[in-house]
């Protein structure tokens, strides 16, 4: 996939002042961003997160998933390290889009799990594409990453694209009674590497 670099700016956040870089896919015109901190183009491996858009979790504080919590923790971790990158990819709902995600949530309210809901709507369990990541990283001078993820399939996808993932850094945050079944399905059906917890009834404090 080809992407075009558009522009950069400073982005002050509660975690520090990041540089925000805008990219656009050639053909689809879909927009993606990269948030960077520190010297990332020195050839050393960079702490990284590829984060697919989740309006409900990232902006509306939904507890149905762990996305918003992972976004916060990834930015905190990058800030603590003093350097790193977060690729924010516009592929809502594991690639099915926001309105279809709402339809999938409705099916989950009726008893389907997150994979079954996608399949009942005629979609694959995970329709995300990471091919835009390599040219974005290349533009920013990054060739080796330490990837914050619980998803080994994401590691495999990036590796097949020619991105050197030197380490998988677990990112287990945000577990609560509302997403207990969702996380269990991600582990059982999507292969995510998640720890078994004894505190299922623990309610995560509001962010």
UniProtKB/Swiss-Prot annotation:
Pfam families, alphabetized: GTP_cyclohydro2 (PF00925)
Chain positions recorded as GTP binding sites: 49-53, 70, 92-94, 114, 149, 154
Co-factor requirement: Zn(2+)
One cellular component (GO) term of this entry: cytosol
EC class name: hydrolase
GO molecular function: GTP binding; GTP cyclohydrolase II activity; zinc ion binding
Alphabetical keyword list: GTP-binding, Hydrolase, Metal-binding, Nucleotide-binding, Riboflavin biosynthesis, Zinc
InterPro entries reported in the protein's UniProt record: GTP_cyclohydro_II, RibA, RibA-like_sf
Active-site residues, as the UniProt record annotates them: 126 (proton acceptor), 128 (nucleophile)
Sequence similarity: Belongs to the GTP cyclohydrolase II family.
Function (record text): Catalyzes the conversion of GTP to 2,5-diamino-6-ribosylamino-4(3H)-pyrimidinone 5'-phosphate (DARP), formate and pyrophosphate.
Protein name (database record): GTP cyclohydrolase-2
